[in-house]
Amino acid sequence: MSKKFIITWDAMQTYCRELAEKQMPAEQWKGIWAVSRGGLVPGAILARELGIRYVDTICISSYDHDHQRDMTVLKAPEGDGEGYLIVEDLVDSGDTARKLREMYPKAKMIAVCAKPSGKELLDDYVVDIAQDTWIEQPWDMSIQYAEPVNRKQK
């Protein structure tokens, strides 16, 4: 993927607050199930914004940094998902979301970002991303010193 969409910490906070507003009233939710690892930060922000104290994880492995591979369920809460928000940072191909729908047919599945191949599997999301674009999440980046241009030429 040659295109990149960079999400800053500030933008992630803003997107998650917008996503939280769509989940009101908060009292309808028993808890949040954050999909590890991408959904952990959005899940924490949503828990704060909605005043939800019960947060658990669904651990599914399907990526090695930028390469998708076979899916493995490492940890999964019991039940059909009724009353729970399943939170992801991104729905890309839809493979993980499809698996989650099978496992938890009554949960509400939400994500911060969605690509065309997977967005129909979501109940809510806030940012549309082109299918050929790689997302750089704030937890995958660091701020570094950049040499001034005039010093690079010497």
Swiss-Prot record:
Residues bound to Mg(2+): D89
A Pfam family reported for this protein in Swiss-Prot or TrEMBL: Pribosyltran
One GO molecular-function entry: magnesium ion binding
UniProt-annotated binding residues for guanine: D92, I135
Keywords attached to this entry: Cell inner membrane, Cell membrane, Glycosyltransferase, Magnesium, Membrane, Metal-binding, Purine salvage, Transferase
Cofactor(s) this protein requires: Mg(2+)
PROSITE patterns attached to this UniProt entry: PUR_PYR_PR_TRANSFER
GO cellular component: cytosol; plasma membrane
Positions that bind 5-phospho-alpha-D-ribose 1-diphosphate: R37, G38, R69, E88, D89, L90, V91, D92, S93, G94, D95, T96
Reaction equation(s) it catalyzes: GMP + diphosphate = guanine + 5-phospho-alpha-D-ribose 1-diphosphate; XMP + diphosphate = xanthine + 5-phospho-alpha-D-ribose 1-diphosphate; IMP + diphosphate = hypoxanthine + 5-phospho-alpha-D-ribose 1-diphosphate
EC number: 2.4.2.-, 2.4.2.22
Binding of xanthine, residues: D92, I135
Chain residues that bind GMP: R69, D92, S93, G94, D95, T96, W134, I135
Entry membrane topology: Peripheral membrane protein
Keyword field contains Transferase: yes
InterPro entries reported for this sequence: PRibTrfase_dom (IPR000836), PRTase-like (IPR029057), Xanthine_Guanine_PRibTrfase (IPR023747)
Pathway(s) this gene product operates in, as recorded in its UniProt entry: Purine metabolism; GMP biosynthesis via salvage pathway; GMP from guanine: step 1/1; Purine metabolism; XMP biosynthesis via salvage pathway; XMP from xanthine: step 1/1
Biological function: Purine salvage pathway enzyme that catalyzes the transfer of the ribosyl-5-phosphate group from 5-phospho-alpha-D-ribose 1-diphosphate (PRPP) to the N9 position of the 6-oxopurines guanine and xanthine to form the corresponding ribonucleotides GMP (guanosine 5'-monophosphate) and XMP (xanthosine 5'-monophosphate), with the release of PPi. To a lesser extent, also acts on hypoxanthine.
Family statement drawn from the similarity comment of this UniProt entry: Belongs to the purine/pyrimidine phosphoribosyltransferase family. XGPT subfamily.
Complexes and interactors: Homotetramer.
Name recorded for this polypeptide: Xanthine-guanine phosphoribosyltransferase
Organism: Vibrio parahaemolyticus serotype O3:K6 (strain RIMD 2210633)
Biological classification of the source: Bacteria, Pseudomonadati, Pseudomonadota, Gammaproteobacteria, Vibrionales
